[in-house]
Amino acid sequence: MTVKTRASIAKKIEKDGLDSQYLFMDPNEVLQVQEESKKIPYKMEIVWRNVALFAALHVAAAIGLYELVFHAKWQTAVFSFALYVFSGFGITAGAHRLWSHKSYKATTPMRIFLMLLNNIALQNDIIEWARDHRCHHKWTDTDADPHNTTRGFFFTHMGWLLVRKHPQVKEHGGKLDLSDLFSDPVLVFQRKHYFPLVILFCFILPTIIPVYFWKETAFIAFYVAGTFRYCFTLHATWCINSAAHYFGWKPYDTSVSAVENVFTTVVAVGEGGHNFHHTFPQDYRASEYSLIYNWTRVLIDTAAVLGLVYDRKTIADEFISRQVANHGSEESRKKSIM
């Protein structure tokens, strides 16, 4: 299916009630970006500082993995796993489903909780993360997409963080309306104090807690609960940009690169239903996977029971079925309802 064909499909989707603001791909703008890119001479410029920092991180993570396997106390292993899961929620339930897509609403205490979890993940402040993610959805697989899959698996996975952004990313990202993000005092606070927050939550507390509560050595605590856990969480998130656009099936829209991928659903705490998500980005569930796989939905639903979350947006099953019949694959959909 061509992008031009998707333009007519998009009109049909909007008429059926799917608000496009937060955000599914705008086919007409995709065509425009593709034409503009042909006129822009571009050569990737490596940011060597980032290369050095990520290289150092992976060396530290390798040390952490060794210490985890051979020397760390079991409490440190459990603690590191908990940090990985909850920092993941700071991305999936927070930066992604709440702030990037507005797929549900949360009370101030819940927003503060998710912001604090997001600091453990250290993946840029939420405003910047959401801006890049909205670019990714609105101009998927073009030069305005920060992790454009047409540039290869490594670029999509982490290479995009090692080079300067394409001019189209800067130009079109600057046109997005981010007033909803800048009007949230929780996000403004995080952005203003981001460096001390992430140093405290991503590295200092993960080191101090094991040392204080179960007498782990500071060396092991830092490298296991700090650097290894952080690096593993990064790759789990990056797998959504890479593996979830390359390896899997397409039940809901065969024209997009995003796929359903069970592995990424597991490692990214519920984000692997990516073909569903790119087709219905405002659905807070982000997939049709069962709760066994969609831990982020479990968190959001639990918070709703506690009165911390409300106005969870979903797409009607009849509309999903119609979308599958017209533009997807019913046989593939069966794999996504597990």
Curated annotation (Swiss-Prot):
Keywords assigned by UniProt, alphabetized: Fatty acid biosynthesis, Fatty acid metabolism, Lipid biosynthesis, Lipid metabolism, Membrane, Oxidoreductase, Transmembrane, Transmembrane helix
Recorded catalytic activity of this chain's protein: octadecanoyl-CoA + 2 Fe(II)-[cytochrome b5] + O2 + 2 H(+) = (9Z)-octadecenoyl-CoA + 2 Fe(III)-[cytochrome b5] + 2 H2O; hexadecanoyl-CoA + 2 Fe(II)-[cytochrome b5] + O2 + 2 H(+) = (9Z)-hexadecenoyl-CoA + 2 Fe(III)-[cytochrome b5] + 2 H2O; heptadecanoyl-CoA + 2 Fe(II)-[cytochrome b5] + O2 + 2 H(+) = (9Z)-heptadecenoyl-CoA + 2 Fe(III)-[cytochrome b5] + 2 H2O; (11E)-octadecenoyl-CoA + 2 Fe(II)-[cytochrome b5] + O2 + 2 H(+) = (9Z,11E)-octadecadienoyl-CoA + 2 Fe(III)-[cytochrome b5] + 2 H2O
An MF annotation (GO) of this entry: iron ion binding
GO cellular component: endoplasmic reticulum membrane
Main location: membrane
Conditions for induction: Expression is regulated by nhr-80 and nhr-49.
Topology within the bilayer: Multi-pass membrane protein
EC number: 1.14.19.-, 1.14.19.1
GO BP terms: fatty acid biosynthetic process; intracellular oxygen homeostasis; post-embryonic development; response to hypoxia; unsaturated fatty acid biosynthetic process
Free-text disruption phenotype from the record: RNAi-mediated knockdown causes a significant increase in the abundance of C18:0 fatty acid, as well as a decrease in the levels of C18:1n9 and C18:2n6 fatty acids. Slight reduction in polyunsaturated fatty acids (PUFAs). Widespread vacuole formation, germ line necrosis and shortened life-span.
Tissue distribution of the protein: Expressed in the intestine in adult worms and in all four larval stages.
Chain segments annotated as transmembrane: 51-71, 76-96, 194-214, 218-238
Pathway info: Lipid metabolism; monounsaturated fatty acid biosynthesis; Lipid metabolism; fatty acid metabolism
Cellular localisation: Membrane
Function: Delta(9)-fatty acid desaturase that acts preferentially on stearoyl-CoA (octadecanoyl-CoA) producing the monounsaturated oleoyl-CoA ((9Z)-octadecenoyl-CoA), one of the most abundant monounsaturated fatty acid in Caenorhabditis elegans phospholipids and triacylglycerols.
Family: Belongs to the fatty acid desaturase type 1 family.
Other remarks on this protein: Cytochrome b5 CYTB-5.1 is specifically required for the desaturase activity, its knockdown or mutation alters the enzyme activity.
Domain topic, free-text comment: The histidine box domains may contain the active site and/or be involved in metal ion binding.
Protein name: Delta(9)-fatty-acid desaturase fat-7
Organism the protein comes from: Caenorhabditis elegans
